[in-house]
Amino acid sequence: MDSLTIPPVDLRLLAPLLVVVTWATVLLLVDVFFIPDGRKKLTGYLAIGGLVVAGLVGLPLWGVTGTTFGGMLRLDPFALTLTWIFLLIGILSITMSLDYLPGQGIEQGEYYPLIMFAVSGMILLAQGTDLIVLFLGIETLSITLYILTGFAYPRLTSEEAAMKYLVLGAFAAGFFVYGIALIFGATGSTRLGEIGAYAASRGIGDLNLTLLLGGAAMVLIAFSFKVALAPFHMWTPDVYEGSPTPVAAFMSVGTKGGALAALVRLLFEGLPTLNEYWLPVLAGLTALTMVVGNLGAVAQTNVKRMLAYSSIGHAGYVMLGVMVAGEQRGPEAFLFYMLVYALSNLGAFAVLIALEHQGENAWRLDDFAGLYQRQPLLAVAMAIFMFSLAGVPPMAGFMAKFYALTAAWEGGLPWLALVGVVTSAIAAFFYLRVIIRMFMTEPEGEPTPTLNRGLTVDIALAAIGTIAIGLIPAPVFALVERSLVVLGG
């Protein structure tokens, strides 16, 4: 009888993840027993501290490559770079929530640990090299977001958004599990490396190939829902509009980042030899996503819904890098785009929160009328974010789109790069429309927005980062290049 073998475990490789999970768990207890109502901001500050500590413990791990838990989790510079991006997203999202929650009358201490648990799910997706781990990561992220989406209870729009997200998310989870079952039935493994080796072998039969392709299709459908690729995007505008604005901001970048990180692993390590099957499908979904997202945004007069459709379009641009993951430039474009998009989009949502303090209807395009005369610095910051999201030089968004389009062109998808160029031109219309309202329209009696300390820090960091990366992109380029030296090794 074979003895039970315990796989080797190197917890050092999981240091940032363990810090986030442990800190969030302890913080839940501390909040319940030691932090009274009315002082829940302290829980938020402690959560920010935990995310900062998680980032710091990752610094000595730069350049370290290894697997743990029997090869189910992998630390490499790619995963570590994404971990730092995810921690930054969590910090900025919590910072913009500190005054928003009490202002809306929904301040609850568990909000901040939930954000931390969501970040832990994103980190798990970046490090996972096993389909079971990827499922755990995406469900950890999703379940926390179901709760956070309905956090504005008893506001009906928030409850409706949470219910829609929960039902459709459960549907996507079913696809994921069924896909894992088919892939395991075809290959006998859930490890991405072993799946890739089996798919590359000449001994794979027609039946197993059919099962493998069917399972891969199921998993890709699940990821498409999480990323909001068309036609799996229909939930996005309603869920973003009904969610508390900081939650919508977090979802717009966090869900995409985590799911696409796992998708890069899956395509690059698990299915590289089957790209003749999945590449045309993903290319079609990407083109449709860019078209639907940007055309949908043009028709919006609600800026929050416009940013939701904008996030759909940007999912298509990020996919340009993901699809050519077999080429060095593809994952580089993905990492660079995720960082730039996170800064620009979180900054834009922070401006929305500054206006939202004046009432529930502060998302209309008319609410931006004459903003430059009422709050000049806020208008300038929003203009920076809009120019960046539109891809206008010298903002960082221009370099990100250029990098992604170049990756698609050099990766053998020139037609898709051209679709990206055309849809970027369409996108410029609705971004510039916001800028025109702020600078070239007279105020119509709207109150002057007030900026609290948290929002000021968020907006300032995002604006400075957007400009700095646009003007001096070389250091960030160097970082992402070093992050991919050992990807898939």
Curated annotation (Swiss-Prot):
BP-aspect Gene Ontology terms: ATP synthesis coupled electron transport
Primary localization: membrane
Catalytic activity: a quinone + NADH + 5 H(+)(in) = a quinol + NAD(+) + 4 H(+)(out)
Annotated TM spans: 15-35, 44-64, 78-98, 106-126, 131-151, 166-186, 209-229, 244-264, 278-298, 306-326, 333-353, 378-398, 412-432, 459-479
UniProt function note: NDH-1 shuttles electrons from NADH, via FMN and iron-sulfur (Fe-S) centers, to quinones in the respiratory chain. The immediate electron acceptor for the enzyme in this species is believed to be ubiquinone. Couples the redox reaction to proton translocation (for every two electrons transferred, four hydrogen ions are translocated across the cytoplasmic membrane), and thus conserves the redox energy in a proton gradient.
Family per similarity comment: Belongs to the complex I subunit 2 family.
Designated name of the protein: NADH-quinone oxidoreductase subunit N
Organism: Chloroflexus aggregans (strain MD-66 / DSM 9485)
Gene: nuoN
